[in-house]
């Protein structure tokens, strides 16, 4: 009788556990990035290029990695020299200030694979390619407060930046192709001269 009661008790204890799904990131901790750190990255724009795309954090969130980058792009007229495309990483842009025109679409003209040794491939976006233009692309006029979601495999090309654009970038990396970067690594990057990794 005692064994029967223990068995019934075990069944009743297991029922609530079945109702609650298991999180994909069991016992993970949250990641906090203070505004001061983001601003420090924005101040590191290389004068010679006028473009700065810097990974602030890349964290394991269970089934996917999520990275936060901060990007500055200076004035551009006449279009970017290339289209960018990332095979596995989707990007979300949240415009902080400035404005720009960007064209997006999957049909990339003269697509060529980026070398695996490329710093952006290794540290920011994972494997992907470049092209000269986007056939039948969609034009977006970005301004402060706007959000643009660019799924993996979709080409994107800035065609006009009147003065500048600054945006926070969220990179979604379900295949975990880009290395993780914690707060300590971020602070170490900030101690280095801009452009050095």
Regions found by a protein language model. Give the residues of each.
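Bacterial N-terminal signal peptides
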Residues: 3-16
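Primarily extracytoplasmic ectodomains and periplasmic/lumenal surface modules that are beta-strand-rich
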Residues: 66, 75, 100-101, 109-110
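Short, conserved beta-strand element in jelly-roll/cupin
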Residues: 87-106, 116-130
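Short, solvent-exposed loop/turn positions at domain surfaces
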Residues: 89, 136-138, 144
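Conserved metal-binding segment of the jelly-roll/cupin
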Residues: 140-162
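A short hydrophobic beta-strand segment most commonly corresponding to one strand
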Residues: 163-179
């Amino acid at each position: 009788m005692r064994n029967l009661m223990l068995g019934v008790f075990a069944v009743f204890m297991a029922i609530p556990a079945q109702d609650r799904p298991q999180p994909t990131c069991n016992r993970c901790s949250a990641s906090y990035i203070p505004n001061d750190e983001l601003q420090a990255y924005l101040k590191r724009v290389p004068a010679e290029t006028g473009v700065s795309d810097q990974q602030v954090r890349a964290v394991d969130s269970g089934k996917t990695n999520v990275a936060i980058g901060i990007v500055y792009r200076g004035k551009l007229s006449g279009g970017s020299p290339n289209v960018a495309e990332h095979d596995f990483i989707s990007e979300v842009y949240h415009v902080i200030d400035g404005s720009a025109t960007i064209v997006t679409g999957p049909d990339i003209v003269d697509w060529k694979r980026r070398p695996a040794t490329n710093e952006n491939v290794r540290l920011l976006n994972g494997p992907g390619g470049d092209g000269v233009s986007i056939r039948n692309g969609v034009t977006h006029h970005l301004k402060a407060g706007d959000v643009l979601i660019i799924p993996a495999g979709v080409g994107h090309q800035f065609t006009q930046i009147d003065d500048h654009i600054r945006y926070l970038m969220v990179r979604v990396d379900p295949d975990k192709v880009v290395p993780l970067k914690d707060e300590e690594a971020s602070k170490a990057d900030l101690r280095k001269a801009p452009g050095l990794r």
